[in-house]
């Protein structure tokens, strides 16, 4: 057994016991749209499209207690591949080194989310970050997000940075309609598997470990091993 398989086994065991994801077990699934604001050809090849998004809490602590928060979205199948493109983010700090570190928060607003790992594209390393632009009440309950989407929409500002350079606007992500889901009917986002040609997470050893963890988690909770936009 490979070391990556061995290290990923706890994810399967935890998912089997909980019958749900070990991390980010509960979230709000919604449809929406991403609109590119960066000039064409500048930075990562994210284009305007419909998306499937999920806002979640990493530990799943109920109510307004501090937790890590997550944002995931799926872009449609690319013309050159049969799989869509998944992007996953979690709450982090704001500095260069803080991009690598998880940071709990007490509020949906004034919180930075990062991909935690850079994306390799055109021989360069690119980072993504997101910040919620919608004004939200104090607190960290998922009901706040769900109610805001149902009543109106939630908007995230998506930015990109090359290497240690400054972040620049890339796109606006809007989630506008919640999708009913439960423990048996949810979407398994996987940025290590669902990507497009020329874009990959790095470093490779960490991507391999993360890929095994996602696979074991799906196996543990009997989640479908497939990807679709809806």
Give the residues covered by each predicted segment.
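Active-site-adjacent core segments of small-molecule enzymes
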Residues: 1-230
């Amino acid at each position: 057994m490979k070391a990556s398989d061995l290290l990923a086994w706890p994810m399967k065991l935890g998912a089997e016991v909980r019958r749900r994801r070990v991390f980010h077990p509960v979230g709000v699934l919604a449809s929406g749209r991403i609109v590119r604001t960066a000039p064409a050809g500048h930075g990562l090849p994210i284009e305007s499209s419909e998306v499937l998004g999920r806002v979640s809490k990493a530990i799943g602590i109920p109510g307004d207690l501090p937790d890590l928060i997550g944002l995931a979205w799926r872009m449609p199948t690319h013309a050159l591949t049969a799989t869509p493109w998944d992007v996953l983010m979690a709450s982090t700090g704001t500095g260069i080194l803080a991009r690598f570190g998880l940071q709990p928060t007490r509020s949906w607003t004034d919180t930075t989310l990062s991909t935690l790992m850079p994306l390799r594209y055109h021989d360069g390393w690119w980072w993504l970050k997101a910040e919620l632009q919608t004004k939200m009440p104090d607190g960290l309950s998922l009901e706040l997000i769900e109610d805001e989407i149902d009543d109106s929409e939630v908007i995230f500002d998506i930015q990109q940075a090359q290497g240690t350079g400054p972040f620049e606007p890339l796109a606006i992500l809007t989630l506008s309609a919640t999708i009913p889901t439960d423990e048996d009917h949810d979407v398994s986002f996987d940025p290590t598997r669902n990507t497009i040609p020329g874009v990959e997470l790095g470093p490779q050893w960490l991507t391999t470990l993360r890929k095994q963890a996602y696979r074991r988690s799906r196996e543990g909770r009997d989640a479908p091993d497939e990807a679709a936009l809806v």
